[in-house]
Amino acid sequence: MLFDSHMHCDYSTDSSMNISEAIRAARKANVGMIVTEHWDYDYPTNPYAFLFDVDDYFKQFNVYRSESILLGIEVGMQKHIVTKDEALIKAHPFDCVIASMHCVNGRDLYEPNSYNGLTKAEALQEFLEDSIANVRLYRDFDIFGHIDYISRYMPYEDQELYYEEFPALWDELFKLLIDGGKVLEINTRRLDSLKAVETLEVLYQRYQELGGRYISLGSDAHYKEHVGRRMAVAKK
């Protein structure tokens, strides 16, 4: 069964979808699903916005758990909270752990002022270098989420990622993931853009050339209408 391995429900502050709606949407899309609620310790703009009661999460959602409905978490990577994050992961029976870059050196990538004074090249170099630093530190995760997260929010005319601009950094990141046995996610959120598909395809091809064998597909759904979205495009 094909799984949508990235979605947010009742325990994610920014989600407008509950678990029952997600299950119905996944069945309609004929996909399995992994709930991956947000967990971001010390989030720059609001330190408590993306935390939740993990024990209650399992207590309430365990009844839904099955071969086609799994319970995971999406951990926001930051170098100074590795110990806290990994203690949380070890303490709970997550079926899947996504590790993602939502911040760079203590700045929220969602916020426009995080890019003040930076050219696109400078912002991307910092993003890749901090991604590499975090992947070196974090051990207990399964999937590295949305490599193009920064493309959603960086305020530049061209928001795409080009392998040829930072080949050494992309290679280093991919090799770390491969050597660590981690899976690279194809996040389907931006796959409605042909330009995004074309530029991301180059990156995923390079990941494969370096020895990457596995990818995951994730819609990053926060609404029921987005569960399983663009999975056919991602499969190609």
Predicted regions: what they are:
Residues 1-79, 91-93, 153-155, 160-164, ...:
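An N-terminally biased module of ancient metal coordination in phosphate/nucleic-acid-related enzymes
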Residues 6, 26, 97, 146, ...:
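Conserved, mostly hydrophobic/aromatic
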Residues 30-31, 94, 141, 212:
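A structural motif
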Residues 33-35, 97, 144, 184, ...:
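Hydrophobic residues within beta-strands of alpha/beta enzymes
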Residues 38-39, 102, 149, 189:
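Flexible loop residues that form catalytic
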Residues 47-179:
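Extended substrate/RNA-proximal surfaces in nucleic-acid metabolism proteins
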Residues 165-228:
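Active-site-adjacent C-terminal substructures of enzyme catalytic domains
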